[in-house]
Curated annotation (Swiss-Prot):
It holds the Pfam family Formyl_trans_C. It comes from Anaeromyxobacter dehalogenans (strain 2CP-C). This is Methionyl-tRNA formyltransferase. Attaches a formyl group to the free amino group of methionyl-tRNA(fMet). The formyl group appears to play a dual role in the initiator identity of N-formylmethionyl-tRNA by promoting its recognition by IF2 and preventing the misappropriation of this tRNA by the elongation apparatus. Keywords: Protein biosynthesis, Transferase.
Length: 312
């Protein structure tokens, strides 16, 4: 097939690799514009743009996608299908209906669960034990199109969104190649989504990372894993921001007496923090505002205290 690809971050590169291996003709890669990044705020090109340049594929980086300009440019390339993977923009009907096979999306969840911009993060943060990828025929709704193919993946106990994303990306590439093969053969029967089963994976905000110590320890740990690397998990210690970098539920430890957020040193292990329902979270690595990351025990030693309150 002649494919026009729309995608921006590293997650989308696995789909490009899969299309290339399957012998599809990539007529263009459409990515978001280069953006300032890092401390120096130097312009950084998207991962998909770097891939396209390395493979000799034309790159388009429009600021706007709904003024007809992009649709006209792609129409001139006569693609058989548009493939979309984490592009980060909402496409209008002119793009969705441009190619004979329409627009096909690689989505990082088992739709209709986790429709939206952050499916990987929310699946981990909500304690899912299984997620996966969906190859979907796009429509004008938010991830509401018909399902062409799905592949499931079991989450590991220590998965974060950062460790899960590359595995889902690879699985998505494999599923995409298979779906296109079946589509060309006329062997796919699209399946409508059940809206009653839908959940929303909204865009993450900084405040999502604030630890709610009144939640059970398992939920606090799941949120930490889901929100790694951004926005991370953070609390306060005597008015200073404290990032919680590593923690896990500790069923073998009694929760410190007092309100949720009460923390005490567990010799040789870390900080036991009281959470909701009488549960305990063992915090092992932290970063106090203005300091480098350190073990929770080193933090306690530096404060010369065995017990203190978090969230104050």
């Amino acid at each position: 097939m002649r494919i026009a690809f729309l995608g921006t971050p590293a997650f989308a590169v696995a789909a490009l690799d899969a299309l290339d291996r399957a012998g599809h003709a990539l007529v263009a890669v459409v990515a978001q514009p280069d953006r300032p990044a890092g401390r120096g705020q130097a312009l950084r090109e998207p991962a998909t743009k770097a891939w396209a340049r390395a493979h000799g594929v034309a790159v388009l980086q429009p600021e706007k996608v709904r003024d007809g300009t992009l649709a006209a440019a792609l129409r001139a390339l006569a693609p058989d299908a548009l493939v979309v993977a984490a592009y980060g923009r909402i496409l209008g009907k002119d793009l969705l209906t441009l190619a004979p096979h329409g627009a096909i999306n690689v989505h990082g969840s088992l739709l209709p669960r986790w429709r939206g911009a952050a499916p990987i993060q929310w699946a981990v943060a909500e304690g899912e034990r299984e997620t996966g990828v969906t190859i979907m025929q796009m429509d004008e709704g938010l991830d509401t199109g018909d399902i062409l193919l799905q592949r499931a993946l079991e989450l590991r106990e220590d998965d974060t969104s950062e460790t899960l994303a590359p595995r889902l990306a690879a699985l998505g590439g494999e599923a995409l190649a298979e779906a296109l093969r079946l589509l060309e053969a006329g062997a796919i029967v699209p399946v409508r989504q059940d809206p009653a089963q839908a959940t929303l994976a909204r865009i993450l905000e900084k405040e999502d990372g604030r630890v709610a110590w009144e939640s059970p320890a398992r939920r606090v740990a799941d949120r930490l894993r889901g929100f790694t690397p951004w926005p991370g998990a953070f609390t306060t210690l005597e008015g200073r921001t404290l990032k919680v970098l590593e923690a896990r539920p500790a069923a073998d430890l009694a929760a410190p007496a007092g309100e949720p957020g009460e923390a005490e040193v567990v010799a040789g292990r870390g900080l036991a923090v009281a959470c909701g329902g009488g549960t305990a979270l063992l915090v092992t690595r932290v970063q106090l505002e203005g300091r480098p990351a350190q073990s929770a025990l080193d933090l306690a030693n530096g404060l010369r205290r065995k017990r203190f309150r978090l969230g104050t």
